[in-house]
Amino acid sequence: MMLQIPDVLTSDEAAYCRGVLDAAPWVDGNVTSGFQAAMAKNNQQLPQDGAAAREIGAIIVQALNANPLFVSAALPRTILSPLFNRYGVGMGFGDHVDNSVRRDPVTGQTLRTDLSITVFLSDPDDYDGGELVVEDAYGSHLVKLAAGAAILYPASSLHHVTEVTRGVRTASFFWIQSLVRDDAKRGLLLDMDVAIQRLSGAVGTTDPSVLSLTGTYHNLLRMWAEV
């Protein structure tokens, strides 16, 4: 399941985040790379334990936890502290698959990476290239979203970032361990949740059909969740 989540941050919030990040020190992006990724990676990254990363990371996590679409789609159990990368002219990131398990250097937690998320912080008109390209059974998907929007996709996906040819692309990226590890099951639960919300709007939250479907949703989640 691949899902665009618009307006995670407002335009003003995204601009504030960019301002803080632009003033922060950046290092070579291979600091956090696994072996495969290091062979393909050419970007800059913000130190994860720095003040800027902590401040902006907290803003992003708070915004995601308040976003109903993200919560419904990801069913987050643990969210890794956000990381930040920057691509200037000539920089890109070749094909790779993210590590299956990661340790959060900020919290010390170890998590299974079920989902990857990128929150775009640069306006798409401010740079050329820099598209996130995610591969799945249906082909290649090019993603370049408005500042403040996010893309959520399975961490098992082969993906890359195309070379930037003008401007600078700044984004936050990180991983989520879901309550439901199986992507297909998460997709079914999201479809059911969306359908329940639509039905509730049409017939009311106390309608017997809404109550029945809500019960079925929670019983499926109870069956599949790992806590």
UniProtKB/Swiss-Prot annotation:
Its EC number is 1.14.11.-. Keywords: Dioxygenase, Iron, Metal-binding, Oxidoreductase, Vitamin C. Its cofactor is Fe(2+); L-ascorbate. Binds 1 Fe(2+) ion per subunit. Residues 78-178 form the Fe2OG dioxygenase domain. PANTHER family: PKHD-TYPE HYDROXYLASE YBIX. HAMAP family: Hydroxyl_YbiX. This is PKHD-type hydroxylase Caul_0045.
